[in-house]
Amino acid sequence: MRKFLREKSSYIILICILLIQIIFMIFYCDMKKGYFVDEVWSYGLANSYYHAQIWEDGALDNPEISPEIFKDYLTVNKGETFKFGSVIYNQTHDSHPPLFYMVLHAISSCFPGQFSKWFGLIPNLLYYAITIVFLYKISRLIKKDKYFAFFPILFFGFSIAAVNMVTYIRMYMLLTMWCTIFAYEHLSIMATRKIKKRNLISILIATFGGLFTHYYFVIFAFPMVLVQMIWMIMRKDYKMTGMYVLSGAIGGAGAVVCYPTILKNLTGTGV
């Protein structure tokens, strides 16, 4: 009972810290003024209907450029809502996988003809919150001190790096979330010396999500997978190794099936 109360109190503290951090981030999101060019492309590639670049078809060649050209590029028009095929098409003319853009398009589709920074910032706040939770779980695995586990989330959660990732309307906060989940599941397997169904499902989802978000995920995941494989083979746990490989392979293959352009971009033969 005492252990249960201690655990409960630690999660209450975690929730309180997370709420404060979200309020902290909302403050910076509210102050956001202006957009870096890549953020403009985020909206354009997500919402422009089968029209990846605004200068295509000579749209900017006229001496007088109508504001409607930019509005059409950055917002979802009526009749073009939830057209994820358009998002995927646009990304085949860009250099990133489509998940981030699909989420941005889905939210923008709920508000046709409207543009708001919050369409991109609210998802980032959600990714940030999930990242904080898994960072806390990682800290608990590394050191079994529930109070020590608060220091990493305080250090990262209020850092300028976190502020930049949340307020920058690109895919990097989403990528960080997938990497944190991926890392936690690997550390969990090593800590418990067994692989659970939950671990397999999470690794599958994180692999799919990470590869479907940014190719940097491969750079992050490869050394972790290599170490995990060596560790399992040295323990001669071939059943665990097989399940682990299958889980990651399904996640990776699923991303490629959903977006075959991944292979071209990873091999340098794409855009």
PLM regions: where:
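Specific aromatic-rich, kink-prone transmembrane helix
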Residues: 106, 134-137, 154-158, 162, ...
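Selective detector of the "anchor" transmembrane alpha-helix that sits immediately C-terminal
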Residues: 103, 122-140
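Transmembrane-helix signature of polytopic, membrane-embedded enzymes
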Residues: 118, 135-158
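Interfacial juxtamembrane loops and adjacent helix segments
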Residues: 47-96, 108-113
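Helix-to-loop transition at the C-terminal end of transmembrane segments
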Residues: 23-41, 58-61, 257-271
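Perimembrane helix-loop-helix junctions
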Residues: 185-199, 207, 219-252
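Aromatic- and kink-enriched transmembrane "portal" helix at the membrane-lumen/periplasm boundary
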Residues: 29, 98, 113-121, 125-128, ...
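Start-transfer (signal-anchor) and selected internal transmembrane alpha helices
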Residues: 1-25, 30-32
